[in-house]
Amino acid sequence: MAPIKVGINGFGRIGRMVFQSMCEDNVLGTELDVVAVVDMSTDAEYFAYQMKFDTVHGRPKYTVEVAKSSPSAKKPDVLVVNGHRILCVKADRNPADLPWGKLGVDYVIESTGLFTDKAKAEGHVKGGAKKVVISAPASGGAKTIVMGVNQHEYNPATHHVVSNASCTTNCLAPIVHVLTKENFGIETGLMTTIHSYTATQKTVDGVSIKDWRGGRAAAVNIIPSTTGAAKAVGMVIPSTKGKLTGMSFRVPTPDVSVVDLTFRATRDTSIQEIDAALKKASQTYMKGILGFTDEELVSSDFINDARSSIYDSKATLQNNLPGEKRFFKVVSWYDNEWGYSHRVVDLVRFMGAKDRSSSKL
């Protein structure tokens, strides 16, 4: 069966990580054929440089070369990765004007951060694509899918624009999924994510009219911020809707983040029972999505971990009054770049398989 043709709109941090995840998973050219990447620049040499040298993730295991799409091209505008050719296309303010139809693209991975509204993302469909996967939380009624949690809800006939949620939701939702599936329940919960700084932040104090604290220097401050990640869990696990909220602290690390969930269970339980349930899930129905560690690890130990969420059993706490057994804290790590990017790839592969089985592709 021929690979599904994919286009990536936005070849920044996440766009590149998604592409590199395909290479690492050995699905480029077999299951997925990335025919084009879209960005403000079409300089293949610069893209190749970015892929070859990464401060956090290191050198790739695959070959990266460049070529020209035609003899008349002034500079190389084609990436050649393990022999696969990927055209570099100039970005357009209107996704409907991108040449997806001409290029035969089936799926667009929308990773610019600009077209997260469903109506705007549908421009890619007008441009000739069949489906759009947004690598961010979405608005406007786009279906939100978290792999390992609610992918079974995907409907090929009606879900043409799908959101992969946020990296933090992808970490929190698997933990909550196990707690609810194994009948611990969540009466109410507060989440904090200790989150590495990202490209949207400032290297030195700068202008940030809407978020004053967010404009402060990322590498030397702990910066309180907002996040909708906890509330978004209610979109993929309806039984928790309205029961979870949270906040974020941006901290001076370049990658890997950690979720701290304090919750009240709906029944009496214990740390030992919670540990056992999460460990079993990590080895069975959540394998590859949820991890489990009982080692004395720190954030850098999770760099390049492709799982969405790694439960830290050493960090689990309880604070119950006499006669109570329902108040707990659980902690889970995640590589907010690498793990999340792998889930984008997994989602595209999952949707592609479902679409083909239902003859939507």
Curated annotation (Swiss-Prot):
Active site: 167 (nucleophile)
Primary enzyme class: oxidoreductase
Positions marked as site (Activates thiol group during catalysis): 195
Residue numbers covered by motif Microbody targeting signal: 359-361
Sorted UniProt keywords: Glycolysis, Glycosome, NAD, Oxidoreductase, Peroxisome
Sites where the protein binds NAD(+): 13-14, 39, 93, 336
PROSITE patterns membership: GAPDH
Gene3D superfamilies to which the protein is assigned, alphabetical: Dihydrodipicolinate Reductase, domain 2, NAD(P)-binding Rossmann-like Domain
GO molecular function terms noted in the UniProt entry: glyceraldehyde-3-phosphate dehydrogenase (NAD+) (phosphorylating) activity; NAD binding; NADP binding
Localization, UniProt: Glycosome
InterPro entries: GlycerAld/Erythrose_P_DH, GlycerAld_3-P_DH_AS, GlycerAld_3-P_DH_cat, GlycerAld_3-P_DH_NAD(P)-bd, Glyceraldehyde-3-P_DH_1, NAD(P)-bd_dom_sf
Subunit structure: Homotetramer.
Name of protein: Glyceraldehyde-3-phosphate dehydrogenase, glycosomal
Organism this protein belongs to: Crithidia fasciculata
Lineage: Eukaryota, Discoba, Euglenozoa, Kinetoplastea, Metakinetoplastina
